[in-house]
Amino acid sequence: NRKLNNTSKAEYLLTRAYLHQKLNESNEALILLEEGLKYIGKSPNKARYNFVCGQLHESLGNNLAARKYYRNVLKSKPEYEMAFNAQLGLLSSESLANNTNILFGEMLEDRKNLDNKGTIYQKMAQTEARKKNYKEAISFYNQSIANAGDNAPIKAGSYQAIADIYLDVFQDYEKAGSYYDSTIVTLPKNESNFDKLSLKALNLNEFIRS
């Protein structure tokens, strides 16, 4: 049965892709995901797999390919959360030569996105950081923190991003240490990077005191 065969192929490839993704092996995961998508047919999960392809391409700097997959997600008219994240992906993978702040602003004004303002401001900050506009990036990250509400991962991610900028760009160790401390206080202890960030904050604070 060809249909069953295609379903089995898709499941095999997508399961392998998931395992590689868990190991942070983005290239391997992407190859398997793209192959798996050829066999998936009209599955309700197709939009989600397109979205993951978009994310992986964006993380590897393949913005043109990322945009293709984000558009595929939006074409399928998914539920709100998936559409929101695909729209953000489209904007964050936009060419740095283009001014995306107007489009981000439209997303901020959309009442449907009221609970996701922290995420939007974080994407705006990431875009400014890619342009090396670090002061603007810090400003948007602070807006992200102020608007994150109970979304601890977003809030912690923005604290960490500010800390990284102060440490790596401005070499302001005291400010970096303060923001790493805020990251640790905010970040859920079951997050995979909690121990690594705790050690980084501890080492930096010891360096400042020495």
Model-predicted regions and their roles:
Residues 1-7, 34-44, 71-80, 94, ...:
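Solenoid-like repeat scaffolds
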Residues 8-18, 45, 51-52, 84, ...:
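"A position-specific structural signal for the A-helix of alpha-solenoid helical repeats
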Residues 19, 56, 93, 127, ...:
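Residue-level signature for tetratricopeptide repeat
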Residues 23, 60, 97, 131, ...:
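Structural motif corresponding to the intra-repeat A-B loop/turn of tetratricopeptide repeats
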Residues 32, 69, 103, 140-141, ...:
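Alpha-helical solenoid repeat scaffolds, predominantly canonical TPR units
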Residues 64-82, 91, 172-209:
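TPR/TPR-like (Sel1-like) alpha-helical repeat modules
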Residues 80-148:
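Eukaryotic tandem repeat interaction scaffolds
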